Amino acid sequence: MKKEYSVYLLLSHSGSMFSRAINFFTDHPYTHVSIALDEDLDQVYSFGRLNPYNPFFAGFVREDIHHGTFSRFPNTTSAIYELKVTGKQYRSIRREIDRFRSDGHKYTYNFLGIITASFNYPIYRKYKYFCSQFVAEVFLNSGIDLSGKHPGLTSPMDILEYEKLELVYSGYLRNYRQAHLKVAVAG
C-alpha cells in the first residue's frame, strides 16, 4: 500500500488595503492562498509582501502565521484545507518549492498578471507570480490540476473548489495553533 502524505492550503483575507481592493472586485471571502508542507504551518510558502508595511515590495515568501504580515493584521480570517497526495506528488511539490527558494531573490509579484487575469487573459512573465498562480503552477507541475484553469487565471476561490480538499480549520489565523493543539490532544 502506498503511503499518503498531506499538504495544506491556507486561504486567508488579512483586511489589508490590497486584500480589501481584491475583495471589492471579486467579492470573495479569501484573497490570498499559500502552500503549507506541514499541519503546524511552520513551512508556508506563497507570493506576497516581503515587508509587512509595503505591499509593493513583494515576491516569493516563506510566511510565518504569527510574525511578519500576518501579525500586522491580527484579524486575518482563514480556512485551512488538507490535501492527501502520493509520495511522488509530495516530493514533486517540495522540489517545486525548493526551485523557488533557491532563486527566491529573483522572484517578484506579478501585479500586471493579477490585473490581466481579471480580464480572463493570462500573462506569463519570467520570475513573476501572484499567490494563486504560484500555488496552481506548483501543483500542476506535480500532477495535480487544482482549478482546471491556466495558473495565470487561477484565483484563491478557484482552488477552493477542488473536490479533494478537506477543511481542517476555519477562523482567525492567530487562533489556529491553539485550536490545532486542542484537536491533537483530544484526538
Regions found by a protein language model. Name each.
Residues M1-G187:
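Cysteine-nucleophile amide-bond enzymes
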